[in-house]
């Protein structure tokens, strides 16, 4: 298992204790470069519907609900 996959596994196990920089690394890997607007990083997803993933820096940590959204989007992308 690679570094990115290990991070995703950690996100699944504990979405409340995720560093913003780690979440950005994972999102950059799966979804490409973000569009940054203010304090939000917005990533596009390749499917119809809600085609965005929105993450914010909360004092160096990522918000837990946003981490869960990223994990869900990665699973959808992988077809799991």
Residue ranges, per PLM feature:
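A short, structured beta-strand/loop element
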Residues: 29-55
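C-terminal structural segments of small proteins and small subunits
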Residues: 57-80
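A detector for short, charged/polar N-terminal pre-domain segments
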Residues: 1-17
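Structured beta->alpha junctions
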Residues: 12-15, 47, 59
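Short, well-ordered coil↔helix boundary/capping segments
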Residues: 17, 37, 60-64
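Polyanion-binding surface elements
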Residues: 14-30
């Amino acid at each position: 298992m690679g570094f990115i996959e290990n991070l995703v596994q950690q996100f699944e196990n504990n979405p409340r204790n995720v560093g913003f920089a780690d979440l950005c690394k994972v999102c950059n890997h799966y979804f490409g470069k973000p569009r940054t607007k203010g304090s939000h990083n917005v990533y596009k997803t390749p499917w119809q519907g809600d085609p965005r993933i929105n993450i914010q820096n909360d004092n160096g940590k990522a918000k837990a609900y946003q981490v869960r959204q990223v994990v869900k989007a990665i699973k959808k992308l992988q077809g799991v």
